[in-house]
């Protein structure tokens, strides 16, 4: 059994890391931590690579990849300390909206023009 990434996943990872190295320098992360707003062009760049729609079906403009692909992307984004709505929009919201049959926003999410924020209350994890 092979638990490694496929050749396609390795190529995606390599392309993504090159993009992040050039587009998300550590200075931009420090500025964001200091309270400056994030650069929307980074999210649009990720969307143009198809990453905003990683789990969204092709019928809605997504890449229709799998959860392992999403994990590999999240790992690369985390390594670069890349801010953005990847987990909330491209993974959590797209997955649950599709499962619920609420497909109207998926095309805009895949295009990177619609971002979703996920909120958790204090009640989660408490008894």
Regions found by a protein language model. Give the residues of each.
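A structural signal for short hydrophobic/aromatic patches embedded in well-ordered alpha helices
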Residues: 12-13, 73
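Glycine-rich flavin
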Residues: 21-127
